[in-house]
């Protein structure tokens, strides 16, 4: 069984320079691969795969262009991984699974430094530090979070990333499969929404964290800092500001974005952990059409803030870890319109109606009624 662990690291100045150089090289090679294939397509030539491009880059392009020799200075496995990512992006585009790959812009795109275990000395982990290829020993801020290799845990691979001037490492650890006893409790249904994050059929409701005072204050501060950044760009055109001041202000904005994102992620993690601790035999959720909801300009911001996809992904991981069956009901299943008492479908039930009232006399909150119907749904797919 493979499990990932992500935590913040505290690299030295020399290690930070190496990380930034490697990430910059990976971004350049990724963009170069995209641009090269775009040129081949415009000229009517055959598409070049990631493996063919890697051979051409190392054996033909760099030897014939001495000014690009700095590409060789970066960690080779990280550069090769960036080419593979570009090839994957093109493959998804050809299968009509995503749009045409975009070029990664410096400071705005999420580029990571990939590393893999090459020998027995690489990827060793102790309680307070981790050995990363080309970087050496790097100190971990959260001591004891990553399983140590002294206890028999094996680190297969990992990535180093930078967000808002903070450095993180994510490692993939091979852990033994644990035999989990069957959960004797009944199943539960979870209805996700915008008013509240999750309404559970056992009566528990997880509020929308974005409506809390803490998030609202941070978003207000973020808008203020973004206006300040916008003014600095305007002053730069007039010659009244400098790039250094803009970089400082951009870092302030990035840190606020990162802080808000961490609060939302932490709330999702704690909510899922609390749900799983009840040890249900199964959990049923609805397959929401998030991409369709994002097209509504009045709802897109609220939908993105709730992070429905992350909730489902992490819930599945926790269910797999604890031996709980995760059931997914079709998006067209009328969970909100079905009376949980008599089973009648109320076709004229509107989104503005918050209370479900049936002719049989059953009265209940629409979201809780939907959670009960999801729990008792008979048509589903196992995630």
Predicted regions and their residues:
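Gly/serine-rich nucleotide phosphate-binding loop at the start of the catalytic core
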Residues: 1-80
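A generic secondary-structure signal for well-formed alpha-helical elements
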Residues: 30-37, 41, 90-97, 196, ...
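Well-ordered beta-strand positions in beta-sheet-rich domains
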Residues: 4-8, 137, 157, 187
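Acidic carboxylate diad motif detector
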Residues: 52-166
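Positively charged, helix-rich recognition surfaces that bind polyanionic ligands
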Residues: 3, 17, 148-151, 163-383
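Beta-strand secondary-structure signal
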Residues: 6-8, 85, 129, 168-170, ...
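Stable alpha-helical structural segments in soluble proteins, enriched in small hydrophobic residues
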Residues: 33, 78, 82-93, 366-378, ...
């Amino acid at each position: 069984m493979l499990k990932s662990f992500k935590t913040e690291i505290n690299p030295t100045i020399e290690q930070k320079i190496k990380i930034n150089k490697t990430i910059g090289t990976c971004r350049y090679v990724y963009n170069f691969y995209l641009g090269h294939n775009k040129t081949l397509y415009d000229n009517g030539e055959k598409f070049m795969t990631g493996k063919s491009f890697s051979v051409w880059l190392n054996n033909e392009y760099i030897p014939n262009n001495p000014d690009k020799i700095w590409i060789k200075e970066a960690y080779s496995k990280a550069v090769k991984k960036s080419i593979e990512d570009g090839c994957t992006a093109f493959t998804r585009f050809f299968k009509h699974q995503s749009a045409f790959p975009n070029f990664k812009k410096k400071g705005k795109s999420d580029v990571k430094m990939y590393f893999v275990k090459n020998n027995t000395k690489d990827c060793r982990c102790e309680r307070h530090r981790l050995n990363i290829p080309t970087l050496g020993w790097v100190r971990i801020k959260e001591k004891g979070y990553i399983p140590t290799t002294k206890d028999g845990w094996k680190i297969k691979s990992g990535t180093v990333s930078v967000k808002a001037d903070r450095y993180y490492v994510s490692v993939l650890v091979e852990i033994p499969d644990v035999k989990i006893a069957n959960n004797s409790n009944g199943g539960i249904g979870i209805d996700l929404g915008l008013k509240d994050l999750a309404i559970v059929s056992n009566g528990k409701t997880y509020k929308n964290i974005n409506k809390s005072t803490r998030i609202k204050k941070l978003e207000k501060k973020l808008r203020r800092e973004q206006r300040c950044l916008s003014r600095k760009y305007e002053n730069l055109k007039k010659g009244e500001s400098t790039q250094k001041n803009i970089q400082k202000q951009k870092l302030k904005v990035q840190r606020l974005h990162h802080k808000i994102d961490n609060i939302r992620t932490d709330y999702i993690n704690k909510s899922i952990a609390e749900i799983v601790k009840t040890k249900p035999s199964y959990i049923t959720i609805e397959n929401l059409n998030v991409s369709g909801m994002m097209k509504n300009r009045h709802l897109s911001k609220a939908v993105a803030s709730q992070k429905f996809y992350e909730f489902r992904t992490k819930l599945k991981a926790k269910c797999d870890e604890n031996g709980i069956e995760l059931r997914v009901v079709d998006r067209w299943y009328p969970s909100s319109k079905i009376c949980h008492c008599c089973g009648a479908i109320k076709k004229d039930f509107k989104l503005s109606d918050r209370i479900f009232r049936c002719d049989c006399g059953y009265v209940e909150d629409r979201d809780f009624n939907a959670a009960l119907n999801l729990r008792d749904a008979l048509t589903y797919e196992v995630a």
